[in-house]
From Swiss-Prot:
It comes from the Viruses. InterPro entries: Orbi_NS1. The gene is Segment-5. It holds the Pfam family Orbi_NS1. This is Non-structural protein NS1. Belongs to the orbivirus non-structural protein NS1 family.
């Protein structure tokens, strides 16, 4: 391969096409209809390697360039390319997959340094809590912002606590007759008094040890208090409470409209659209007047998801009046996965998701109808059937497939998914990096990308493998800010033509090895031994980063 490319000075996209076609040629099925595939009676599409060797040995540049043109032409049908790649890579033969992955991992480690990703990792603040909580907009703690009142007065508390700068005000929801906006002038004095009293009585956060001022209040049902003593429950619920406060603080600012559209899919006219959507009188099948009242009056269980507002089900109710019953049923039965509920309880194969940020970056619509796939753990991403321009995504612990019509859209959609769900701290540390490599491989092979987009894709490959590897001082970079992360990935330096060609070869080989490895573990092929990846056999190149950090 390398001799052929160098002898005839083939580079750039033509070299990438040649490299790709060589890998899938053995499984390629050709109809020979155009007859341009036949050289001396042999189909070069099905015997590409033999034709390359013959053209190189015979020193026939015209024939060599024709081979390259055939490979480039084949790349125009990206759907066929992906299917042929998947078919070819999932039929392993005897080879040193472990050695090849180590070499690819070492090259990606070098690229991590040269691509600017390591420079950015140095600039990031240290990750305070290494147990990262994955938050998304499918759930919300926003109902607990609103103030419960009875006869115009705030309902008396039964217990108080705090999480960092947020006062937790526990009360009995049955004692309230309405819920109101916490910014209303008439209750500001009482609201501020609650903050001062909580700050006086509880000067240290029981969850984090934070000592400081209390600036906000959340009004929580008293039934929640025992569950907040469970570490995992409290860890997740507290983060969603913090996210709800951040969204509430944007009320009255330009960002409020973005948040409302992201959460509800529609923005009402007039002032304070967030409060309108939360407190608006709804025609619910129960006596509840608003979604805040419906949520607060219903207790959850030991699963933290059962206490939050299910935004996907809410959007179904906003779009279809008769589906408000689903919202009540979902909370009454204490479901934890909205996509499982839609797929299995309501036999709905698809639902709408909203991504305002991706819309702003690509110019496409923020609304997408997605196909509901399997729950995480029921099946891996490798088994999810992807056809045409579909790419896999995830809401909570459930996979879905969405259509991406351009390479840019596929790249950004995948980058957002990886930022949220993949933590790269060395290859083979967990299954997450394999999932990330597979998704990036889908983007690399299924969509036509520009050099700038492949440069961004390389940075994502590096992040998937090493983004969360410890720095020289033992700290882990904090990549939690999605906006900063996308700026680093999408606005980084563009590779030169030589760098692009080498990067493509590395990414392509890594993807091939991952797909081969995944299917070899599930199906026993004669002559193929999948490398062990337990105990001392774990491949972790992240340890080598400690020497690289010395330069910074």
């Amino acid at each position: 391969m390398e001799r052929f490319l160098r002898k005839y000075n083939i580079s750039g996209d033509y070299a990438n096409a040649t490299r790709t076609f060589l890998a899938i040629s053995p499984q390629w099925t050709c109809s020979h209809l155009k007859r341009n595939c036949l050289f001396n009676g042999m189909c070069v599409k099905q015997h590409f390697e033999r034709a390359m060797i013959a053209a190189t040995d015979a020193e026939e540049p015209a024939k060599a360039y024709k081979l390259v043109e055939l490979a480039k032409e084949a790349m125009y049908d990206r759907e066929t390319v992906w299917l042929q790649c998947f078919k070819s890579f999932s039929q392993p033969y005897e080879e040193d997959v472990e050695g090849k992955m180590k070499r690819c991992g070492a090259q990606l480690l070098e690229d991590y340094r040269k691509s600017g990703m390591m420079d950015e990792a140095v600039k990031q603040s240290a990750l305070v809590n290494s147990e990262r909580i994955r938050l998304d907009d499918s759930l919300s703690a926003m109902p607990y912002i609103y103030v419960p009142i009875n006869n115009g007065q705030i309902v008396n508390p039964t217990f108080i606590s705090r999480y960092r700068q947020i006062a937790y005000y526990f009360y009995n929801p049955d004692a309230a007759d309405d819920w109101i906006d916490p910014n209303l002038f008439g209750i500001r004095g009482q609201h501020n008094q609650i903050k001062r009293e909580v700050e006086r009585q509880i000067n240290t956060c029981p969850y984090t040890g934070y000592r400081g001022r209390v600036f906000q209040v959340m009004f929580l049902p008293i039934q929640l208090i025992n569950f907040l003593r469970m570490d995992d429950f409290a860890k997740h619920f507290n983060r969603y409470a913090s996210m709800a406060i951040q969204q509430y603080l944007r009320v009255g600012y330009a960002e409020e409209i973005r948040y409302v559209q992201q959460l509800f899919g529609k923005v009402p006219t007039g002032e304070f659209p967030l409060h309108q959507m939360m407190l608006m009188r709804r025609d619910l099948p129960t006596r509840d007047r608003s979604i805040v009242e419906a949520r607060v009056r219903r207790s959850g269980d030991e699963n933290w998801q059962s206490w939050l507002l299910p935004m996907i089900i809410i959007r179904e109710g906003l779009d279809h009046q008769d589906r408000w019953e689903w919202f009540i049923d979902y909370m009454d039965r204490k479901h934890t996965c909205q996509l499982c509920y839609l797929k299995h309880s309501k036999q709905i194969p698809a639902c709408s998701v909203i991504d305002v940020r991706a819309s702003e970056l690509t110019g496409c619509s923020p609304f997408k109808m997605v196909k509901i796939e399997e729950h995480v753990g029921n099946d891996s991403v490798f088994k999810t059937k992807l056809v045409r321009d579909e790419q896999i995504g995830r809401i909570g612990d459930h996979y879905y497939t969405t259509n991406c019509y351009t390479g840019a859209e596929a790249l950004i959609t995948t980058a957002i998914h990886i930022h949220r769900w993949i933590r790269g701290s060395g290859i083979w540390n967990d299954e997450g990096w394999q999932e990330g490599i597979f998704m990036l491989g889908r983007v690399l092979l299924r969509w036509e990308l520009t050099k700038a987009q492949r440069s961004a894709l390389l940075r994502l490959f590096c992040f998937v493998c090493y983004g969360y590897a410890p720095r020289a001082d033992g700290t882990i970079p904090d990549w939690n800010n999605l906006g900063n992360f996308l700026d680093i990935i999408l606005k980084g330096p563009e590779l030169s033509e030589d760098e692009d060609e080498r990067a493509y070869a590395t990414m392509f080989e890594m993807v091939r090895c991952i797909i081969t490895l995944c299917y070899a573990e599930k199906v026993h092929f004669a002559g193929f031994a999948a490398p062990a990846c337990e105990g001392g056999e774990v491949i972790n190149l992240a340890a080598r980063m400690s020497q690289m950090w010395m330069e910074y």
